[in-house]
């Protein structure tokens, strides 16, 4: 089991911001990444739909022999993490908790901005995190409609991207925020543009490195780390990717965002007799 892959999934390419940190933290681990680009973004979808698709993707990852799963999507973590843990109690399943706690520790003004999707803000996980760690600060919630789509399209910089970002940033700046939480895995791909627009005095919190460290700790505790004598794996044997949309489009995004050249597998959505979704290779 220790040599089995780690599964990661997101609605699209955003989870690659988590994937690249796992690559650095765990160089001997094989990884299987699934992008549900047929339904990207998850942020405006219903909780029932997000849960159903997350469950089907997890079923696929388990069938592929994954020893652990990372829900590399803030929206899916907010809505589907606990149902997935109940469905697979034998499997370590990690999600993304909004990085409110470190932001509260960093702020000097007492005002923290959070950039996320509507579904993340409405989720119990986010509300519980804010209630636990942020009662002594003001939290400014900024819904970033369309930002995940910009990242999916590869629009990571330029005047149009800057104008869109400033539309999200200005309400937080006006409220006095000096710390901003990136509450969607797509957003780290525009972190340099955000930092340039807000200036060096603003702290921008990307939770991805902490997620990778936590995954390493969990695997070590459960005895699931790949054998140390294996050493770092070659990319061709280490990385597997699958998408529910166009493999060629995903491959281009993969090269653009994380500098990896690979051929992804196409997956298709079908329905079981009870109308629940299921994933199959195309």
Regions from the PLM with identified roles:
Residues 1-282:
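Non-catalytic structural scaffold of enzyme domains
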């Amino acid at each position: 089991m220790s040599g089995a892959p780690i599964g990661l999934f997101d609605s699209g390419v955003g989870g690659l911001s988590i994937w690249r940190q796992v690559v650095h933290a765990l160089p001997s681990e094989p990884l299987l990444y699934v992008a549900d680009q047929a339904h990207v973004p998850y942020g405006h979808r219903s909780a029932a739909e997000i849960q159903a698709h997350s469950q089907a993707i997890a079923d696929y990852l388990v069938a592929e022999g994954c020893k652990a799963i990372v829900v590399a999507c803030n929206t899916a973590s907010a809505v589907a993490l606990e149902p997935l843990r109940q469905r697979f109690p034998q499997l370590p399943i990690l999600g993304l908790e909004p990085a409110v706690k470190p932001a509260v520790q960093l702020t000097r003004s007492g005002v923290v901005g959070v950039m996320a999707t509507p579904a993340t803000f409405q989720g119990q996980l986010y509300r519980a995190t804010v209630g636990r760690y942020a009662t002594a600060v003001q939290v400014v919630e900024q819904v970033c409609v369309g930002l995940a789509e910009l990242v999916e399209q590869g629009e990571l910089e330029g005047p149009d991207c800057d104008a869109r970002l400033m539309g999200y940033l200005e309400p937080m700046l006006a409220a006095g925020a000096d710390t901003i939480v990136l509450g969607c895995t797509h957003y780290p791909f525009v972190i340099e543009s955000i930092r340039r627009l807000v200036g060096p005095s603003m702290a921008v919190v990307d939770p991805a490195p902490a997620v990778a460290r936590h995954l390493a700790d969990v695997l070590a505790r459960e005895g699931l780390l790949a054998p140390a004598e294996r050493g770092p794996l070659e990319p061709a044997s280490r990385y597997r990717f699958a998408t529910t949309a166009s493999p060629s489009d995903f491959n281009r995004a993969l090269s653009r965002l994380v500098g990896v050249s690979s051929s992804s597998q196409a997956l298709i959505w079908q329905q079981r007799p009870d109308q629940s979704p299921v994933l199959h290779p195309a």
